[in-house]
């Protein structure tokens, strides 16, 4: 499979989806979401999921494929995208679009990911020991893997221990990179902090206007307030509002603040990859410059 792949990445609220929609129509391409929350059904407004009208314009994939109670891993994502790319007719490039850096990295770098299903009972037992002891245990069985994980990063520590206890092999020995052979163009969107902050404020207000509060309320009634996805950006703040812990104005301000912090972390992640070509979506010739780059890539 040598069909070119065009990646559109960057921080949240930089206009990735809008650009992808325009380019996909010009190129007669499909759009593959690289967003870890858009895979879940019913989480629509708070994840800025493409509307049904937008999905009617261009075929979208890896959206609405899981129940909110299901676990969907990076390995699952990699498997599905790889199969999709292999089955796509070699007529035009596919567009991989989103801000979940690890999803994108799993495709463009060809990460080798341990196929170990989550072990709830094991995790519960490890969590009871505390992060300090878990990290010490990891350092004993896989010092190389522990060196790559921050001592306070409970999620990655537990995952590394989980992989070791299930397979008997340290996670560091099960990882690696096998880059794909097809050509890849990576386009990154990055605007000034002031412009991004304004877009974040506008998008937060738009989500509230579209019915984010009702969406969260419905999800809480159906799945309960302990659903892990309800602790993610945009949903956690509205949940606290619905629980009477803050006013709606406070929830809105919290979403804006947390989105800004999240965007900063995303920017740091993506800026570490030299192969990404960066564009400012607020510049006058933004679309023309992106299109010229794509034409040169496809020539």
From Swiss-Prot:
Substrate binds at residues 12-17. Its cofactor is Mg(2+). Its EC number is 2.5.1.75. Residues 35-38 are annotated as: Interaction with substrate tRNA. It catalyses: adenosine(37) in tRNA + dimethylallyl diphosphate = N(6)-dimethylallyladenosine(37) in tRNA + diphosphate. ATP binds at residues 10-17. The record marks 100 as: Interaction with substrate tRNA. NCBIfam families: miaA (TIGR00174). Monomer. This is tRNA dimethylallyltransferase.
């Amino acid at each position: 499979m040598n069909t070119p792949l065009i990646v559109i990445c960057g921080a949240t609220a930089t206009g990735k989806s809008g650009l992808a929609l325009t380019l996909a129509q010009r190129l007669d391409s499909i759009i593959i979401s690289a967003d870890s929350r858009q895979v879940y059904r019913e989480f629509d407004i708070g994840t800025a999921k493409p509307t049904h009208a937008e999905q009617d314009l261009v075929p979208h994939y890896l959206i609405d494929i899981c129940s909110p109670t299901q676990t969907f891993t990076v390995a699952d994502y990699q498997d599905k995208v790889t199969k999709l790319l292999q089955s796509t007719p070699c007529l035009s490039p596919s567009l991989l679009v989103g801000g979940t850096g690890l999803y994108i990295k799993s495709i463009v770098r060809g990460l080798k990911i341990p196929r170990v299903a989550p072990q709830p009972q094991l995790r519960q037992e490890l969590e009871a020991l505390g992060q300090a002891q878990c990290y010490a245990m990891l350092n004993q069985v896989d010092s190389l893997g522990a060196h790559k994980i921050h001592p306070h990063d409970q999620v990655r520590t537990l995952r590394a221990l989980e992989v070791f206890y299930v397979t008997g092999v340290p996670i560091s020995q099960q990882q690696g990179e096998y880059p794909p052979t097809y050509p890849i163009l990576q386009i990154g969107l990055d605007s000034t902090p002031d412009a991004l902050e304004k877009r974040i404020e506008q998008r937060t207000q738009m989500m509230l206007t579209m019915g984010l509060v009702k969406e969260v309320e419905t999800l809480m009634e159906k799945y309960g307030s302990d659903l892990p996805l309800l602790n993610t950006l945009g949903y956690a703040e509205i949940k606290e509002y619905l629980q009477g812990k803050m006013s709606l104005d406070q929830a809105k301000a919290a979403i804006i603040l947390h989105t800004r912090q999240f965007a900063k972390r995303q920017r740091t992640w993506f800026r570490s990859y030299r192969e990404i070509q960066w564009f400012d979506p607020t510049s006058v010739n933004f679309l023309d410059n992106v299109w010229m780059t794509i034409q040169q890539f496809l020539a």
